[in-house]
């Protein structure tokens, strides 16, 4: 079967999803189309994501495809990138990159 992930960070390239193109209740939409939905309350937490993926793997062999809704904070961990759409599709300059990396000591390699 199939596992889909949806990043729900509340941002689009032109602003918040509520202001630009409100998608409504994504969970209800996937459910209406016959998907099993698993919610990940802290989609910025690697351990929680791994747990939800394991749950999805166990469920995806049943009758329904599985969707994991990841509630994330865009730019999480970098003070000047968090909670704004302005970094959607924009690369930091060298100075901003250095600052951002210094604010996030953990990497995927730590897991």
Listing of model-derived features with the role each one plays in the protein:
Residues 1-111:
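Glycine-rich ThDP/TPP pyrophosphate-binding loop and its adjacent helix/strand module
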């Amino acid at each position: 079967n199939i596992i889909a992930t949806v990043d729900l960070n509340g941002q689009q390239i032109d602003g918040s999803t509520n202001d630009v193109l409100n998608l409504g209740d994504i969970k209800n939409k996937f459910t209406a189309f016959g998907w099993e939905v698993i919610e990940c309350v802290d989609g910025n937490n690697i351990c929680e994501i791994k747990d939800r993926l394991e749950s999805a793997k166990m469920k995806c062999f049943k009758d329904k495809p599985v969707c994991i809704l990841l509630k994330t904070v865009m730019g999480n961990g970098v003070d000047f990138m968090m909670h704004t759409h302005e970094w959607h599709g924009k690369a930091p300059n060298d100075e901003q990159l250095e600052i951002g990396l210094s604010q996030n000591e953990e990497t995927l390699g730590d897991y």
